[in-house]
Structures are given as structure tokens and as C-alpha cells.
A protein has these predicted regions:
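Covalent nucleotidyltransferase core used to form phosphodiester bonds in nucleic acids
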Residues: 97-100, 104-108, 115-119
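Bacterial Sec-dependent N-terminal signal peptides
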Residues: 1-24
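Primarily secretory-pathway and cell-envelope proteins
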Residues: 21-64, 113-186
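Peptidyl-prolyl cis-trans isomerase
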Residues: 78, 110-112
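Conserved interaction-surface patches within small, structured recognition/assembly domains
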Residues: 72-87
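Short glycine/proline-enriched turns and hinge-like loops at secondary-structure junctions
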Residues: 87-90, 122
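Pre-active-site segment of Zn-dependent metallo-hydrolases
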Residues: 66-67, 78
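A short tyrosine-centered beta-strand micro-motif
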Residues: 89-98
Length: 187
């Protein structure tokens, strides 16, 4: 009886120890932040890999909503009002979704529900902003989904998403003049 109890405890402790081990994730987490004007814009996302799969039109079907990454929906955090493709986006935290309508037109959605795991519980009525963009052929294929900022100037930047053989660019503008006024008033 004692040997059975000891065997059970040893087996249980081994099982608990294995469960506590952290292992590499297939789609590791990442974030990128850029100061634009006087505000920080942050993208938090998970990086799925191509892994010899067809991405566009297959893994990510055309005309269906996609979480713009893996695991939890990709997050866009802005600390002040900005413009995306000349459309206003108030400061806040948003989930980013993408509908690849076709090979030539995509809809990017900034949604106010920020605790979504995937796109299953997405609700259109929570959309803050939708913009249309045209994906372009990437100069080199990207194995793991990547967001990064390019063409950074004092008041603007381009947010690029690269994965597989495509790239999507979003023009972001900040209005530092309005933020300067707020800073002066709060001083």
C-alpha cells in the first residue's frame, strides 16, 4: 500500500513538473513601438510562420475576417488621436482585423473589443475605423509575420505588415500641434 502511494506521489510530482515547463510557442509574441509626433503607436501581435503553406486565399481565406496574426487578436495602441490613411482614429487600444477581399483589395479594421482570441467573437458594431488598402508584392518573402515602421518623419510613419509574399502599408499621421497645446495647458 505504501509503495502504491509513493509511486502515485512520484508520478504526480513528475506530471506537475512537466506541466510547469515553458516551451517555445509556434507563433511567438512580438511588439513594435514607434513615436510619431508626440504619441507612441504600439503593435502587439503573435508571429505565425508560413511553414510551406499557401497563406493568402488558403490559410487566410479571401473575403473572411482574420485576426492579423495568431492567438489573441493583434493589438494597436495609440496614446493620442492619429490619422490612418487620412481617417481619424481616436487614442485608445484596438484589435486589428483584416479582410483580404481579393488579391488587390484588403479592408483593415480597428475594433474596440480588445480581448478577443482570434476572430470568432468579432462584432462589426464595435468597429471604430475601416480603411481599404492595396497589398503589394514583397521584395523578399517573409517566413514569420512581421509588423514594422518605415518612412518615419516628425509627424508621420508607415506601418508595414509583411508575411509570405505580400506587404501591406498603412500611412499614419499624428498632429503634434494639438498635443503641444494640451501639454502647455497641463503644465
Amino acid at each position: 500500500m505504501i509503495q502504491i502511494l509513493i509511486s502515485t506521489l512520484v508520478g504526480l510530482s513528475f506530471t506537475l513538473g512537466v506541466q510547469a515547463q515553458e516551451l517555445p510557442k509556434p507563433s511567438p509574441s512580438a511588439s513594435v513601438m514607434q513615436r510619431i509626433g508626440l504619441t507612441d503607436v504600439t503593435i502587439e501581435y503573435s508571429r505565425p510562420g508560413v511553414n510551406d503553406r499557401t497563406i493568402w486565399g488558403d490559410l487566410v481565406p479571401y473575403n473572411e475576417i482574420w485576426r492579423a496574426g495568431a492567438n489573441k487578436a493583434t493589438q494597436v495602441i495609440t496614446l493620442a488621436d492619429i490619422k490612418i490613411e487620412n481617417e481619424s482614429l481616436p487614442k485608445g487600444n484596438y484589435s486589428l482585423f483584416i479582410i483580404p477581399v481579393s488579391e488587390k483589395e484588403w479592408t483593415l479594421i480597428f475594433n474596440k473589443e480588445t480581448e478577443l482570441w482570434g476572430a470568432g467573437d468579432y462584432k462589426k458594431e464595435m468597429d471604430q475605423l475601416r480603411v481599404s488598402v492595396t497589398p503589394i508584392k514583397a521584395s523578399t518573402p517573409t517566413e514569420r509575420l512581421e509588423y514594422h515602421f518605415t518612412d518615419v518623419s516628425m509627424n508621420s510613419a508607415v506601418l508595414s505588415m509583411n508575411w509570405a509574399d505580400l506587404q501591406v502599408n498603412l500611412n499614419i499621421q499624428a498632429n503634434p500641434t494639438s498635443q503641444v497645446k494640451v501639454n502647455i495647458e497641463n503644465a
